[in-house]
Swiss-Prot record:
Residues annotated as binding Mg(2+): 242, 285, 312
Keyword Metal-binding: yes
Keywords recorded for this protein, A-Z: Cytoplasm, Glycolysis, Lyase, Magnesium, Metal-binding, Secreted
GO cellular component, one term: extracellular region
Protein name: Enolase
Pfam families for this protein: Enolase_C (PF00113), Enolase_N (PF03952)
Organism annotation: Nitrobacter winogradskyi (strain ATCC 25391 / DSM 10237 / CIP 104748 / NCIMB 11846 / Nb-255)
Length: 426
């Protein structure tokens, strides 16, 4: 009854107006699953390959017809008739069918669309939510949201070098309280920025993109908004950063174009440590560049016992890179992005490896998103306790938050908000 009878791929648009892949998987019993694939702006060099057409006469070369054709043709031919509940087996078949180390032949965007739609179809067939299908009966932890309320770097047209400034409501009791807290701070920040004469345009992930001179200036505005909204910085609401430092790591140095400063590897680690000391910062993602292994070890030794250090470009949701990082004492947490690796099975393997090593895991969106809310279910399914899915504006971001509200309501008394305990690695 759960045999795959049809797979339909199509080209749709993401939140930036660029094409991406959407896939429907239809089963013999009439069940159907749909998934849309996200896309990143600041991408790690070691991510699985997103296949683009390169035909400049369509979408400036960013079309995904080749990936869609792979879904409708070669992939369906290979897995049509297989049992949708055999997720690991089908994912392995897709990896072997592609035959490359980075999924570059068929495209990770084609493979991931099928992999996620497959899980949704199987859940639909069993008439259970996706988080329950993937995570079983123990899936009940609602994650602390990392809400990106100030955008910089490649996500915004402003001089701020760091890419994301986030708030984490760690001191509230429920996810719905966390969302309300974030929304109130977001709107307070809008008023404070306007009052100070800054624009309140938003970046790719829905956060404000004001012309501020430095990370410190952005953090000061956020601290003020937290207090003005009636919350206590550090107690009710903690801060998190994503410098995305690979983007400004040049010739062994960190070149801050907006600030007009250059920092050595040691100075970069010291700068992050000072920020974490001066502000209630509990998490820093990609504070060092993806290939700056010396810097990662340095900053981990320096503040890894008191601050969550998340590897995104460093690990790219890849168990080989994660295992190497664990062995060598780099970071203490991994960012989980399904499209960095390309299948649900490999995504879950990365989460499991992190847990076994005592690392935390943060489920994450990409800057180019869709209305697909799969990562909300995966955050609950894995009990990872943290989700990063943008600001409190733009419906592509709100879709994930709204799904978490539904899950919390569904779980009722069983629902448990992760709170500060989510940062167990520190």
């Amino acid at each position: 009854m759960t045999a795959i009878v049809d797979i339909i791929g199509r080209e749709i648009l993401d939140s930036r107006g660029n094409p991406t892949v959407e896939v429907d998987v239809v089963l013999e019993d009439g069940a159907m699953g749909r998934a849309a694939v996200p896309s990143g702006a600041s991408t790690g060099a070691y991510e699985a390959v997103e296949l683009r057409d390169g035909d400049n006469s369509r979408y400036h070369g960013k079309g995904v017809r080749k990936a869609v054709d792979a879904v409708n043709g070669e992939i369906f031919d290979a897995i049509g008739g297989m049992d949708a509940e055999q997720q690991a087996q089908i994912d392995e078949t897709l990896i072997e069918l592609d035959g490359t180390a980075n999924k570059g032949r068929l495209g990770a965007n084609a493979i991931l669309g099928v992999s996620l739609a497959l899980a949704r179809a199987a859940a639909d067939s069993l008439d259970i939510p996706l988080y329950r299908y993937v995570g079983g009966v123990t899936a009940r932890t609602l994650p602390v949201p990392m809400m990106n309320i100030v955008n910089g770097g490649v996500h915004a047209d402003n001089p701020i070098d760091f890419q994301e400034f986030m708030i984490m409501p760690v001191g509230v009791q429920t996810f719905s309280d966390a969302l309300r807290c974030g929304s109130e701070i977001f709107h307070t920040l809008r008023s404070e920025l306007k009052k100070a004469g800054h624009n309140t345009n938003v970046g790719d992930e829905g956060g404000f993109a004001p012309d501020l001179p430095s990370a410190g200036a952005a953090l000061d505005f956020i601290m003020g908004a937290i207090v003005k909204a009636g919350y206590r910085p550090g107690d009710d609401v903690a801060l998190a950063l994503d410098p995305a430092s690979t983007e400004f790591f040049k010739d062994g140095k960190y070149v801050y174009g907006g600030e007009g400063k250059t920092r050595s590897i040691e100075e970069q680690a010291q700068y992050l440590a000072k920020l974490a000391s001066d502000y209630p910062i509990v998490s820093i993602e990609d504070g060092m560049a993806e290939d700056d292994f010396e810097g990662w070890k340095l900053v981990t030794d320096m503040i890894g016992k008191t601050c969550q250090l998340v590897g995104d470009d460093l690990f790219v949701t890849n168990v080989t890179r994660l295992a190497d990082g664990i062995r060598n004492g780099r970071a203490n947490s991994i960012l989980i992005k399904v499209n960095q690796i390309g299948t649900l099975t490999e995504t879950l393997a990365a989460v499991e490896m992190a847990y076994k090593a005592g690392y935390t895991a943060v489920m994450s969106h990409r800057s180019g998103e869709t209305e697909d809310s799969t990562i909300a279910d995966l955050a609950v399914a894995t009990n990872c306790g943290q989700i990063k899915t943008g600001s409190l504006s733009r419906s592509d971001r709100a879709a994930k938050y709204n799904q978490l509200l539904r899950i919390e309501q569904q779980l009722g008394a069983q629902a448990k908000y992760a709170g500060r305990a989510a940062l167990k690695a520190v």
